[in-house]
Amino acid sequence: EKYYAQGARVAKWRTALKVDVANNCPSDLAIEVAAQDLARYARICQEAGLVPIVEPEIMIDGVHDIQTSVKVQEQVLTTVYKKIQENGVMLEGSLLKPAMVVPGVDAADKSDPTEIAQLTVRTLERCVPGAMPGVTFLSGGISEEDASIYLNEINKVPRKTQTRLTFSYSRALQSSCIKTWKGEAGNVDAAQKQLLARAQANGEASKGEYVPGSQPSDEESLFVKNYVY
């Protein structure tokens, strides 16, 4: 209520889950606790008039393949929405911020954008209620260009629901801008152009209209092992 009074209208809560098959991670208990925390936070937000962004992040650290990512993501999202229902959260007044379905960063077999898009959409349709107004993907350490390409391919996949699929990137939106700026006043104009270019790219990708390579980007991986805020 204090934050609402100060002008806030949206809040975000992130839980991070690492995939490590050999050590049974994430465990059923870890998923249950994370889902309950997210659902309770969402209910508290709505009671205060805030729109909750629910962020159950499946981190890309690891050697797991994309099918393992699918399995974990389906379990996590199914559990999250079970807890959201139990806590009386209004679906239409909330947003989901998940990771795209990708293999671990050190996986032996990589996946192309089409496979990533198809499995991501299938996972969402299996696990996320159609009443959800929007899904705002996190980038999770993939490069700026890949984040745009994957989102673009996702929005080309035929879907059964009208849930908006868009972006809520940090590193994949800001990296080239920050590298260009370097904290120096003389670089502000160039840095702003970099930021606008990535915003334009992701805006087009949200409509399935992005042409890969049409906007300047930092194509380096933004992955940071054990990344924390």
Predicted features and spans:
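Short, contiguous, pocket-lining structural segments
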Residues: 30-33, 46, 68, 72
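Glycine-rich anion/phosphate-binding loops
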Residues: 1, 26-41, 75
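Long, hydrophobic/aromatic-enriched structural stretches that serve as scaffold segments
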Residues: 1-17, 24
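Short beta-strand segments at enzyme active-site cores
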Residues: 10-15, 49-58, 90-99
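Glycine-rich, proline-tolerant flexible connector loops at the mouths of alpha/beta enzymes
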Residues: 15-29, 58-64, 105
